[in-house]
């Protein structure tokens, strides 16, 4: 297994519905952040139309001109031919790598002999599937969010046996509310007693998703359109040493402009010299430790 030399950090796509102006301001600041790679694009719902394909491409060009590697993220749940046609515009952009979160996008990239990033929403749980994706053009794989370090170690051993371990990078989503499930239903609209077809894109009122509490007042989930997300914030900032020789890129999911400072905090603690202060019932790292997802273990 190849040992990494330098850990790279990525800023994942904004998963929430923000206004075009908010996004433009966010990515102007992202251009000056310490992120090596920046993902952007609508990854949740095609009804979020405030920012058009051309707008995303303009922001991508601005980021690339500043030296960032830019990746265009795409929908995790493609439900209509019209959505597929719009995704073709992303795939055919001519400049930027694509993050495929649906096998339809994998096929679009493969048909054009284009490399792609396999997103964490793809159901990829064994080395044979990784080999198939790699043959189709995968150059980076972001592992599913619910899987552990032990599982990753075993997976990469299988990849070594298949002779593909050195043919792609490994990325792990390490900060943010985790997307746990996707549905054709819109839970944010339902929480406001609106049908999905008449949702009025009410998700824009919840810039970090809508909290969902248990009867014991525990924040168990966050609703974000068709996504159900973890209630606690996943934070692997103190687990970076355990990623050595396994992970090439650490992804942080945007939760506002304070995410830029969090990237710096991760970098500062890469060797364990500046541990992050994590709080029970707010932060979690259970999945990485092969525990219940909402657990926090030192």
State what each model feature region is.
Residues 135:
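Active-site neighborhood of glycoside hydrolase catalytic domains
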Residues 2-124, 128, 132, 142-298:
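Active-site pocket-lining/capping segments in soluble small-molecule metabolic enzymes
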């Amino acid at each position: 297994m190849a040992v990494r030399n330098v850990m790279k950090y990525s800023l994942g796509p904004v998963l929430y519905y923000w206004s075009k102006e908010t996004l433009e301001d966010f990515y102007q600041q992202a251009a000056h952040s310490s992120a090596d790679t920046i993902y952007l694009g609508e990854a949740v719902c095609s009804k979020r139309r405030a920012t058009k394909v051309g707008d995303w491409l303009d922001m991508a060009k601005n980021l690339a001109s500043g030296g960032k590697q830019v990746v265009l993220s795409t929908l995790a749940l493609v439900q209509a031919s019209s959505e597929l046609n719009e995704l073709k515009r992303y795939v055919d952009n001519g400049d930027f790598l694509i993050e495929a979160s649906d096998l339809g996008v994998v096929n679009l990239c493969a048909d054009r002999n284009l490399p792609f990033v396999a997103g964490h929403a793809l159901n990829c749980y064994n080395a044979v599937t990784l080999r198939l994706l790699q043959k189709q053009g995968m150059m980076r794989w972001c592992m599913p969010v619910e899987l552990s370090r032990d599982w990753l170690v075993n997976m990469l051993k299988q990849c070594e046996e298949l002779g593909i371990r050195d043919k792609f990078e490994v990325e792990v989503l390490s900060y943010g509310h985790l997307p746990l499930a996707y549905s054709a239903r819109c839970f944010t609209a339902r929480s406001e007693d609106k049908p999905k077809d008449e949702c009025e894109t009410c998700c824009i009122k919840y810039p970090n998703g809508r909290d969902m509490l248990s009867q014991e007042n525990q924040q168990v989930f966050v609703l974000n359109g068709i996504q159900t997300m973890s209630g606690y914030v996943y934070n692997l900032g103190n687990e970076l040493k355990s990623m050595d020789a396994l992970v090439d890129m650490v992804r942080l999911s945007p939760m506002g402009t304070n995410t830029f400072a969090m990237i710096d905090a991760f970098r500062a603690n890469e060797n364990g010299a500046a541990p992050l202060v994590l709080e029970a019932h707010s932060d979690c790292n259970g999945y990485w430790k092969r525990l219940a997802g909402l657990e926090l273990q030192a």
